[in-house]
Each structure stands twice: as structure tokens, then as C-alpha cells.
Amino acid sequence: MDEKKALQYEESKRAEEITDIELVSVGGIDVEKKYGETKRALKSRHVQLIAIGGCIGTGLFVGSGSALSESGPASLFLSYVIMSFVIWTVMNALGEMCTYLPLSGASPITYIERYVDASLAFAAGWNYWYAYVFLVASEVTAASIVIEYWTYAVPTAGWIAILLFLVAVLNSFFVKWFGETEFWFAIIKVIAIVGLIILGVVIFFGGTPKHDRLGFRYWKHGLAFREYIVKGASGRFVGFWSAVIKSGFAFILAPELVIFSAGETEAPRRNIPKATSRFIYRLIFFYIFGSLTIGVITSSKDPRLLNAISSGASGAAASPFVIGIQNAEIPVLNHIINAVILTSACSSGNSFLFAGSRSIYSLAKEHQAPKIFKYCNRWGVPVISVAVTVLFACLAFLNASASAAVVFNWFCNLSTISGFLAWICVLVAYLQFRKAMILNNLWETRPYKTPFQPYATYLTLFLLALITLTNGFTVFVGHTFTAGNFIAAYITLPIFLVLYVAHKLWSRNWSFGKRIEEIDVTTGVAEAEALEQMYPAPVPRNIIEKIWFWIA
């Protein structure tokens, strides 16, 4: 009976697909065209800047201050190195799968269902969606806190409403508008971080009004690895591991921004590899060098930093970058950096709303969510998905009646662990994809290849599993246990499990993943190759264009 039910479920899915499809000819090949399809309007330069700019938010500019104060500069730096490796591996896995099969409306959810299991895709898909909801809420909350650095004239709820309306509008019209907005937001963030790193070098060598050569002063006298919660070597390890977990928020669900945009990108087989292959250099420069700069210019025991964290201070007041600049007695820059932080929070909220709406849109296309979420307006935007994501992002209004810092930390914890679970699912899908491609003698035909596989994936899976299971370990250390912190740290795990089991019960498909020989690695490839022919590579006419085409 169970097998019959599972067969009926699969047949109903195929029947729905048939009623939603018409065929058009592209390059002489019949290609599926879904009604209400998104449109490929994002260009290479949009994808390149989304790859790095969309994820640079409050985690790096503000959230790093908490990790610095608790763990010390060396722990902060090493935590960013470790998380950069994790992100690089996840990006490579997604890049290979997406470049091989860049279907319209495809997402990580598509590949998890195709290569692993429909139930895992269901759980991962909804996990993606509510993680992005939390991220939109957290970035909007952060932006409202940043504005309060200048004025309290408008209530917090007012700023949250204005910012939610702004990102909703940017995500409701041409996707090109979203791409252009993120392009310029990202340029501002990149220029700011480059400037801050250069300024950090100047401060390091004493080129400030005080002429005080800092060097690695704040790494000495036992401050490099600070004791946290408990004393001695155990305390230093607790501090280090706490920094690793907290640093995850600065990166969380960043690789997926590129993959969610792939279905709306011109020439995805050319532009997605370009974005993913250069991601490692951006990680090294912006995140690793950025965290090193923070540890050089700001002491983990700085009174301003500690007071800002304990009081839930707003924006630049809690940014270790700004505190280091103020200590160097450089005027005005604190307001400039606060403006950059505000831009970053708005930009990240905008990007996360885009990804969240595409998550539920992709779920609907995979028949894992109501059909209404597949509806796209005449500009190719899934407006129902956007509206529902914005509606739930109104959780940010909790900030109007609770401590901003407390609510911000709740959202950080929930979204971070959801992101870790999503990455585990992606890497499992990649290993299945790899095995199926090898079995079908197609492994060497994939258009984009990444190094150190599958070993990097196995190591990253181990790290992610360890981080996920221990993310709330500090509540068990010393006398710091609180029910709120415990729930925030681990509530995502039972939610994910309930989603997975519920789908198994509904579909009556009790297999734990597809057998390798059952995995389809050919359907859709001809369409992808035909699509590639529609977008010939641009030929540079001069040295300036050659440089620009390399960058973007």
C-alpha cells in the first residue's frame, strides 16, 4: 500500500508538470517554458557584485565586535579563516551543480530533490525560507538600530516599516532593478572595506594624528586568545569555539545568493563559474583581512566596545572599526562608517528578501509549496512569494517592544543554524551528484571543475556537523544556562526533523535517499547547452574593456 501511495504521489507530480508546461524551440531544441516564468535579466556585473556584496552586512561591521570582546583578536581571525574555508567549499559545490544544470527557477532545493530525496528537499527548502525571513528581519532590525545613532525622532517601529517597504518595492518590479541596486550598494561596501583595511595599515604603522604605532599591541599579554566563561586553557578554547560559531552569521547563506540569481542570469554557464571561482579571493581580502584589521586597531578590552555591547548601543557605536578609528582620533569617519553600515544592512536585507522569495518560488515549482507561489507578474517577479516573505519578516517589529540587542541575537542564532543545516544538505547533494556523474561517465564533461574534491566536502561536512551540534555549548559551560538561549540555539533542529518526517508521512516514500543509479543527470542538459549558445561571450575591443570583462 505504501509503494502504491508513493507511486501515486510521483504520478501526480508529473501530471502537474505536464499541465504547467508548453514547449518552445530554442536553438532547434524543444525547451520547457513554465507559465509565470522568471526572466533572465541579470548581467555578469550584477552577479559578480551580488557574489560578495550581498552578504556583507552587519555581521562583519558590527557583529564582529562581540566575538572580539569575548574571544580576542587571534580567535576572531582564525574563526574567519575557518568559516571562509567552509563557505568556499559550499560555493564550489553549488557552483558545479548549478553550472552543469542552470535551469530557470532552479535553486539549491532543486538539486537536493534531484540528487538526494524529495523529503530532504522539502525540509531544506522551508528551512531556507524561514532562515531568509529571519535574516531579513535581523538586517532590518540592525538598520533601525544604526539610524538611532543619529536620531530618536522616529520610533523604531517606524524605521522598520519604512525599510521593509523599501526592500519590498525593490523586489517587486524588474529583477534588473534589484541587480542594479545591489550592484551600487556592493560597490559602496567594497570601497568602504578596502578603505578600512588601508586605514588599518596606516594605524598599524602609526600614521595617525597621535603618531601611535600600534603594531600587534592588542595581541600581547594574553589578549590574543581571551578566556571566556571559564578560566585557563579551557576558557581560551571556549572563547575560540564561540568565535567560530558567531562568525558564521557574517557568512550565512552567502553562496546561495549567486545560485538563486542563476535562474535569472544571462549566460549562467559563463557567469556563474566566473563568480564562484573568484569568490575565494574576495573571502580572503574582505573577510580575513577585515577581521585581521579589527584585531589590530581595536582592543578586545576597549571600554567603548564593552560599553556598547553591554548597553546594546546602535550602529557605529558598536562597530570595532569605528571604535578603532575614534581611538586614533580621526574625526568625522564615524558618521561615514555608520552610513556605510546602514547601506550594508539595507543591501543585505534586500538580497535576503530576493533569496527568500526565490526559495518559496522554487518550492512551488518542485510541488513542495502551494501553486500560488509560482505566480510571476509581467516583469517576471514572483510577487506572491515576495509578499509572503515580507509579511513574515514583520517579526522585526518585535524590536519595538523588546531590547534590540536581544531580538537581534535571537534572529542571528536562528538564521545561522538554519544556514548550517542548509549547507549540510547541499554538500550531501553534491556528493550524490558526483557519484551519479562518475557512474554515467559524465564527470569530466561538467563545464566547471573545482579543486580538492571530494576531500574538501567531507572535511566541511564534519566541521558543519560539529558546529551545528555545539552551537549552543556555552549555555552548558559555567553557570550561564538560560532556557531562552538554549531554545534559540537548538529549536531549528527539531523543526527541520518535523518537516522531514511530515513529508515522509505524506508522500509515503520511506527510502532514505535515491540510489545512485536512479539519479537523473541528463534531463535538462540539452536545454542548458542551447541556452549557452544564445549568449555568446563578449569580445573586448580595447584594453579597458578587457580589464572590465575580467572584473565583471
Swiss-Prot record:
Membrane topology (UniProt): Multi-pass membrane protein
A Pfam short name: AA_permease
Topological domain spans for side Cytoplasmic: 1-48, 95-117, 171-184, 261-278, 357-378, 432-457, 502-552
Keyword Kinase: no
Membrane topology (Extracellular): 70-73, 139-149, 206-239, 300-335, 400-410, 479-480
Similarity section: Belongs to the amino acid-polyamine-organocation (APC) superfamily. YAT (TC 2.A.3.10) family.
Protein name, UniProt field: Probable proline-specific permease put4
Natural source organism: Schizosaccharomyces pombe (strain 972 / ATCC 24843)
